[in-house]
């Protein structure tokens, strides 16, 4: 599992990203009949083990960072590649994301608790940014405050929309602009 979403799912919240907008992370999980493995480059291994998956029974399998094409050779030592698939087609394996996605649809109780806590933290971030907003602030300033309040709570905003006054009813997804707040504010965080 190489996508950020599947890696987070299989590791109960592990974060394999470097770039927020990348589909795949810098680590992948391989699960076989023989065991579970963390596939990553030599330069990413320390952070992933220390901060993301060290509590899990994943055996680290590393490849040189400058040879990402060498992963299939590493995989061949662990599994029969003719019977191995990937969520994203990583490492030249057949992609079966549609088959992986339903596995994430039903949440276990620890996942429900994490999502409830995330929702509460996100609400606090939005509320703090809105309370700090003042007439004359630009939508961009307010969006930056939402992002900063989110970051303080270990939340990475994927969507940070802000509209002031007449822009609220005009646009369904108002990207923040230099428009200044006069009276009314809309903020959306995902």
Walk through the language-model features, giving the residues of each.
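Generic anion/oxyanion-binding catalytic loop in active/binding sites
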Residues: 104, 131, 171
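Short catalytic-site patches enriched in acidic/histidine residues
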Residues: 7, 11-20, 96-100, 137-190
């Amino acid at each position: 599992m190489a996508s950020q979403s599947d890696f987070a799912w299989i590791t109960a919240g592990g974060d394999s990203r470097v770039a927020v907008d990348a589909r795949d992370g810098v680590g992948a999980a391989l699960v076989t009949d023989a065991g579970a493995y963390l596939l990553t480059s030599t330069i990413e291994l320390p952070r992933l083990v220390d901060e993301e998956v060290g509590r899990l029974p994943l055996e680290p399998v590393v490849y040189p960072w400058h040879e990402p094409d060498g992963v299939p050779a590493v995989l061949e030592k662990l599994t029969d590649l003719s019977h191995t698939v990937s969520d994203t087609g990583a490492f030249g394996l057949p992609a079966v994301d549609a088959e992986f996605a339903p596995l994430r649809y039903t949440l276990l109780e620890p996942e429900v608790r994490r999502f409830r806590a995330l929702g509460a933290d996100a609400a606090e971030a939005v509320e703090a940014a809105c309370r700090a907003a003042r007439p004359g602030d630009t939508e961009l300033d307010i969006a930056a405050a939402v992002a900063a309040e989110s970051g303080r709570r270990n939340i990475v905003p994927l969507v940070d929309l802000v509209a002031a006054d007449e822009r609220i009813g005009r646009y369904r997804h108002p990207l923040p602009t230099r428009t200044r707040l006069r009276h009314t504010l809309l903020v959306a965080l995902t």
